[in-house]
């Protein structure tokens, strides 16, 4: 419906205001929902502008930017060296703006004595190399793995950031939705799961250490936006060159406290205020 | 004039009307055929497209594969990976395991209930039990699935000390609950269809109610019961929501029923929504859909066949 509304809006506006800015946003599926909400809110405040948002994946979005078929590319990862080169060949100079943050919490059962794990241990656990809690200093019990279905952005993000693109253990039980994962871990004393920040109810968040020597950090809005929590990432918008005019107005609005509040409403983590201000286009 | 209102002009109308009604009757058939064609069409690239075959050929889906150099060959379902793996064996095993548990749980209960209601229960008791069991059929599977995920899994784990909370037994029992009304209804109908003359003959020969039921009615209705079991099996294989929620969805090769399983239907439900359109993964999911379609079609056909044979036999036509 929302997308339909955007399309209808597009048609109407095309008839009424010939000079209206027409912006296309394309890319990451993780960011589609946020992009759509931003577009809706922005269009409410600026009735003249028309924004079209679609997904397809970060790679698709970046390809579209390189081919000049989108104004804004949404990406849940930074562009690769190779992609920058491709863009240059086509006369495109990508301009990167971090617009929001995203983080993943690791859940443990409240009865589990383990309270913190390193990224290496997490990788070992989820790739199936570590199968017993005693290998990470816990009880002599089999580790029961819970995760998300492979269609979820969370699945991909965790795989990329924690497993370094290695496969999940075949034994990982996948459940539809973070709520189901939290529920399963809350009932399974030896379970471990992952999902969005601020979901932990009836389970405890596991503090995560970047490596053996660093401090264990619990996932909260503050530690993610402060950058100390290791399983987090920046989400980007890419433009062709430094944005001007309508595009500039849009990105600055998205970075404004108002835009960042929208991000928080749809379960993303807002950028710290100073970073958001710094990222704004002058 | 009034008398000949239906002649001769209305011949055409009659013809059209008749064909229209026939078309309505055929609509379901055409629907099924079109659905099958559509599903199969999306699976075709597995057999024809070189590029797709490189990732997911028929042999890659069936046999053990070496995915990384220097590692043991294995069956694995990991479609989202740097090396996508599309082995169907773990999924097939999971589907069968869930269906077996479902049948082991549902058949004794459903057949027992059918024998009781058709042979022993008083009229009032029968009027009470039948609708309640048939009400189970109307229970949305998502509700059953949720029940299995939240309640049943814990009960089973506490009672039997399973390592894995969500496993083939948990999913199978929940599936069994969904299958009971199917088996019960068909089996009960089959027993009721046993002609009264046969019963009367048995009673006349001095058989008591137990003997009538177990040596007379049950053997006569056996094909009907078998048909119910077969139809129930078909449902157990195709049922999606329950297994998606209650089985744990881990695609592993294991003979143990206490471990998690991933079924064909749950795989399609979980992965199709976000799969890249036209990718090998997309084709494989539709191939699984085709397999499921054929499985359930053949099974249901078999069930119907048995049922028809029974009817003919009881009516003395064969």
Language model: regions and residue ranges:
Chain B
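Transmembrane alpha-helices
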Residues: 186, 195, 203, 209-246
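Generic hydrophobic transmembrane alpha-helix motif, especially the helices
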Residues: 134-179
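C-terminal transmembrane helix and the adjacent membrane-cytosol boundary/short C-terminal tail
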Residues: 188-192, 196, 203, 230, ...
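Interhelical loop and adjacent transmembrane-helix boundary motif
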Residues: 157-159, 243-293
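Membrane-embedded alpha-helices of multi-pass transport/permease systems
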Residues: 40, 108-115, 132, 143, ...
């Amino acid at each position: 419906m929302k997308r339909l509304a955007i399309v209808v809006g597009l048609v109407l506006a095309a008839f009424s205001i010939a000079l209206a800015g027409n912006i296309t946003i394309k890319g990451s599926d993780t960011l589609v929902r946020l992009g759509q909400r931003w577009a809706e809110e922005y269009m409410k405040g600026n009735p003249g502008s028309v924004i079209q948002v679609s997904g397809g994946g970060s790679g698709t979005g970046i390809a579209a930017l390189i081919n000049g078929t989108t104004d804004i590319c949404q990406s849940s990862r930074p562009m690769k060296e190779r992609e920058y080169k491709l863009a240059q060949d086509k006369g495109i100079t990508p301009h990167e703006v971090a617009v929001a943050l995203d983080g993943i919490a690791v859940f443990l059962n409240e009865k589990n004595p383990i309270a913190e794990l390193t990224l290496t241990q997490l990788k070992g656990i989820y790739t199936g190399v570590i199968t017993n809690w005693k290998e990470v200093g816990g009880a002599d019990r089999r580790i029961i793995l819970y995760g998300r279905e492979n269609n979820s952005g969370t699945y991909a993000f965790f795989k990329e950031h924690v497993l370094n693109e290695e496969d999940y253990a075949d034994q990982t039980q996948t459940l539809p939705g973070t709520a189901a994962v939290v529920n399963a871990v809350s009932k399974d004393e030896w379970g471990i799961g992952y999902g969005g920040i601020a979901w932990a109810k009836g389970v405890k968040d596991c503090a995560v250490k970047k490596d053996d020597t660093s401090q264990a950090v619990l996932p909260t809005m503050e530690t993610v936006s402060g950058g100390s929590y290791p399983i987090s990432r920046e989400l980007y918008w890419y433009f062709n060159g430094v944005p001007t005019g309508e595009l500039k107005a849009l990105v600055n609005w998205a970075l404004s406290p108002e835009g960042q509040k929208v991000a928080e409403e749809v379960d993303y983590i807002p950028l710290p205020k100073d970073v958001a201000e710094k990222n704004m286009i002058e | 004039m009034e008398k000949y209102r239906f002649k001769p002009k209305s011949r055409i109308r009659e013809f059209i009307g008749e064909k229209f009604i026939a078309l309505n009757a055929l609509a379901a058939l055409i629907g099924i055929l079109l659905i099958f064609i559509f599903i199969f069409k999306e699976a075709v690239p597995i057999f024809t497209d070189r590029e797709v075959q490189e990732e997911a050929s028929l042999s890659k889906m069936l046999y053990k594969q070496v995915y990384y150099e220097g590692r043991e060959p294995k069956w694995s379902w990991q479609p989202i990976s740097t090396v996508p793996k599309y082995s169907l064996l773990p999924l097939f095993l999971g589907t069968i395991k869930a269906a077996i548990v479902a049948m082991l749980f549902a058949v004794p209960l459903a057949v027992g209930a059918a024998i009781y209601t058709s042979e022993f229960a008083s009229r009032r008791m029968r009027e009470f039990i039948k609708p309640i069991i048939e009400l189970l059929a109307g229970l949305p599977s998502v509700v059953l699935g949720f029940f299995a995920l939240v309640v049943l899994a814990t009960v089973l784990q506490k009672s039997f000390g399973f390592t894995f909370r969500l496993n083939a037994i948990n999913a199978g029992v929940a599936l069994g609950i969904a299958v009971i009304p199917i088996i019960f209804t068909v089996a009960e109908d089959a027993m009721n269809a046993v002609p009264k003359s046969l019963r009367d003959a048995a009673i006349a020969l001095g058989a008591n109610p137990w003997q009538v039921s177990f040596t007379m009615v049950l053997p006569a209705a056996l094909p009907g019961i078998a048909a119910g079991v077969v139809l129930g099996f078909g449902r157990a294989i195709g049922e999606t929501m329950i297994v998606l929620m209650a089985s744990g969805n881990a695609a592993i090769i294991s003979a143990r029923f206490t471990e998690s399983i991933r079924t064909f239907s749950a795989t399609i439900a979980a992965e199709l929504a976000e799969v890249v359109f036209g990718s090998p993964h997309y084709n494989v999911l539709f191939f699984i859909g085709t397999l499921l379609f054929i499985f359930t079609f053949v099974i249901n056909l078999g069930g119907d066949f048995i049922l028809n044979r029974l009817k003919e036999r009881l009516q003395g036509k064969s």
